[in-house]
């Protein structure tokens, strides 16, 4: 970080010559000097060059107005104002969180000024670095010799082997040197929450508006289990979102709890909806408790917020209404909601404490902020027994954490602190909304078909758009007002084939075909439904990437309308079965898969499959214990009616459990089986379109088997 910007506007010798001297002095201190043309050019530079560490400008020309503009972007950036003897400096800077230094235009002062700038730059770096990351950088720079783990010793061991050297060269020396042992006492301990690790947790809690925050190094799958193990002791009953992540199913397999499921909605597109407000009411819960064997009043609730497709809840209503001791919002996909006013009241850490309740929010820092994979956080608001909670934390946390993951978690929080973080999120929101509008424009201008966007008719305001009962765009039935909101950065594109009410069209392009084309061109889709594709506009998505996606979508339309051969348009798919796809054209492939979906009446089938849950014969914990005792057998998928499932069955998409361990598909819930059979049939007819179904195993004959409990194990 060594770039200094000088606004080159002087025009007179007594100003130009001192600046030229300063330029030379700064270069001797290894600064890189750049000269923006004007104010707008400077602001663009600050926006696009994060390594800028200072701005030098003429106070007579720019003064306070420029400072205010810079403050909105980075309130910590050092500013250096040059003034002459007659300049007016009677301004109050008390309200600005700025580092402003004033210098006079004078010859012979360049060395002193350059040293002052170097000192201020060091202070700036020290200010923006969070505590653990700062301590880790310091430790690596000191280059101490250690006789403890890890065995590669800062990368030395790798360089003793040819293949190890290749590995070392790829990842670089700092990655190796920062991979250190928990024996390094000056960095404290992740497990004991001491030293710089404790300071990092306190720092993160302040940034995310939490009472207490924890860094988790094995993803939100682990964070969810930590919260659940503490909040729901064995023998208790919990309320849990049926559209929960599979990690929460694993929690129920590990802990002997009785689940009562919240039942979310879904629309014809297969987009996951929210849990209706009625599900949170005391009377509804009391009825479910009465209907569920061995259930007692729930002590804990788990809600997925946002949904996979970007729907956020009115969390204030849930916190106030839900009568449980603790509420866990699994917010893996929205770690950014604390940094824009459009998310106020729509996330777990919004607002203050809730009397008599503990609110948890787990977030996948790595998913949509800037952190290494597996980086996750737990935020807590309310009173917990920290010693007991830490037992659950240590149960799921390695004693050899990777400090790179831990430091990246803290750095992600530091990036979101203050105006700089707000600017990052606002930039994502603006890019996503602009992309949405471009799709709508191209749809209007295109001949024949084009992609559509799942969103309200008017998106002129920057907000989370509400789903209203008097609107039809969302396709949900009996929606509650002021309950669910669409996050603008989660962009769902619609392909032809299905209307919002579930009516099937004669012409259709299944989204899986578009996803395969995009993958051929280096663009990975987050989630693919029957006729929809989800794209996430995270802070890492820039204008270039958004334009590349637009270009790829228009290229797909052009190639599809030309009816190119599959082997030319989708070469990877062609290689799955060259004989099958040899002479097939893209329109034939699309129409045949579309007809298969129409044949099964997918919208109606999905409604029925998710309307009636399989019967819970035993808890997931009890079913897993029987599996551990070897009391399972495999049967064909077609034979699972009336059998108790041993594992969760989770088709992707949508990526949420369809059948839980210990549940039985009955005649009443047969649509669940029919839905699974339809997914398998598409893959059987068209090589390369097999659905990934966790818990179902494809055999050599192409049929699927599932694991069920042996008949005698029901007792």
UniProtKB/Swiss-Prot annotation:
EC number(s) per entry: 4.1.1.18
UniProt entry keywords in alphabetical sequence: Cytoplasm, Decarboxylase, Lyase, Pyridoxal phosphate
Cofactor: pyridoxal 5'-phosphate
GO biological process: lysine catabolic process
InterPro entries linked: OKR_de-COase_N, Orn/lys/arg_de-COase, Orn/Lys/Arg_deCO2ase_major_dom, Prn/Lys/Arg_de-COase_C, Prn/Lys/Arg_de-COase_C_sf, PyrdxlP-dep_Trfase, PyrdxlP-dep_Trfase_major, PyrdxlP-dep_Trfase_small
Disulfide bonding pattern of the chain: none
Induction pattern: Part of the cadB-cadA operon, which is under the control of the Pcad promoter. Expression is regulated by CadC. Induction occurs under conditions of low pH with excess lysine and anaerobiosis. The global regulator Lrp also has a positive effect on the expression of the cadBA operon when cells are exposed to moderate acidic stress in the presence of lysine. Repressed by H-NS under non-inducing conditions.
Cellular localization per UniProt: Cytoplasm
Keyword set includes Protease: no
Catalytic activity: L-lysine + H(+) = cadaverine + CO2
Enzyme class: lyase
GO CC aspect terms: cytoplasm
Top-rank taxon: Bacteria
CDD domains: Orn_deC_like
Notes on how activity is controlled: Inhibited by ppGpp, also known as the alarmone.
Molecular function via GO: guanosine tetraphosphate binding; identical protein binding; lysine decarboxylase activity
Modified residues (N6-(pyridoxal phosphate)lysine): 367
Entry function: Inducible lysine decarboxylase that catalyzes the proton-dependent decarboxylation of L-lysine to produce the polyamine cadaverine and carbon dioxide. Plays a role in pH homeostasis by consuming protons and neutralizing the acidic by-products of carbohydrate fermentation.
Quaternary structure (record): Homodecamer; built of five dimers associated in a 5-fold symmetrical double-ring. Interacts (via C-terminus) with RavA.
Record family assignment: Belongs to the Orn/Lys/Arg decarboxylase class-I family.
Name used for this protein in its record: Inducible lysine decarboxylase
Gene: cadA
